[in-house]
Amino acid sequence: MYTQFGSKIGKFSYLFGMRYEDSHIEVNQLTSNIYKPKKYNNFFPSAFLTYQLSENSSISLNYSKRITRPRDRFINPFASYTSNINLFQGNPDINPALSDAYDIGYLHKWDKVTLSTSAYFNHTTNSFQIVRKERGDQINGVPVIINTPFNLAIEDKTGFEFTLNYNFKKWFKLNGNFNFFNNKTTGNYTYTNSQNTLKVQNFDFNTNTWFTRITSKISLPHKIDWQTNATYTAPQKYRQGTMNGVAAVNMGFSKDILKDMGTISINVNDIFNSRKRIQDLQLPTVNSYSEMQNRKRQITISFTYRFNKKKTDKDPKQNKTKMAKAKIWDKILS
């Protein structure tokens, strides 16, 4: 259930919202005979304030309450194996994480360039943390490591973000995004190990990292569109190890055919086959190195046909209005 109220007074506009959610979740693992029903409800207020500095620039101040629900894998108690010595087991007792998100932003438009910047702070309780520990057995003398998510931390994330849209020519558009943030986490995990000894793991850590994305769209002769997307996630540290940086490039070509009633596309996902999750794990008695790749390079050819409707460009002003509304709804519903 959701309600909102907004208005504009001169150069100042505001939008207030309130969302209510009532959730019911049941985990029924027949193999392990585990049944865990969960019920929770929450109110999610939001407020968006904007002041128009000039025809081409504005500042904004926003707040929203957000929820991050555990994925299916996080609540499934059935173990899945990355290898015979490294397994992941979900936690049916895990709860959603709740965040208070604040940001202040600035937007400026030039003839061919649009710059959007923001500084933000997110405070999260019940943050998910993956606890890695020895299961107590060995395979060929190597300890078996089990990875399980728990709600055991408070997380404060502070950062800034830049987004730049550059319409160089009618046939060439470029979009860039850069996001830098500091992540401070506090929490402890207490458990009894395989030797029946009580252990306390401290999960306090403070780390900086960043992410960037560049997207280009070029209109080639014969009405062929060429789009390229490149991303890079910087290395990250966490309490029990490190994760290497990840770079990846996707590329696609598309062309409208059959009097713009159909579109044929060719897409290459992860051209350089570099989207790999590489981790170094350091436990008190075990060090491990792992590589994981969900999907290797993929090439996809597709054809889309639109019945009774041609592909047409809508009014640019109407598109901008819809995009602005979509961003607000993304913040409200996230």
Please provide the spans of the model-predicted regions:
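C-terminal beta-signal and adjacent terminal beta-strands/loops
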Residues: K255-S334
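Outer membrane beta-barrel strand-and-loop segments of large Gram-negative receptors
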Residues: M1, N91, N95, W110, ...
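Repeated loop/turn-to-beta-strand initiation elements of outer-membrane beta-barrel proteins
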Residues: K11-Y14, N56-I59, K112-L115, W171-L174, ...
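Transmembrane beta-strands of outer-membrane beta-barrel pores
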Residues: I9-K11, Y20-E26, Y63-R69, F78, ...
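Surface-exposed extracellular loop regions of Gram-negative outer-membrane beta-barrel proteins
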Residues: M1-T31, Y40-S46, E55-A101, F121-N147, W171-N182, T215-Q236, ...
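Residues on the lipid-exposed face of transmembrane beta-strands in outer-membrane beta-barrel proteins
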Residues: T3-S7, A47-Y51, I104-H108, A119, ...
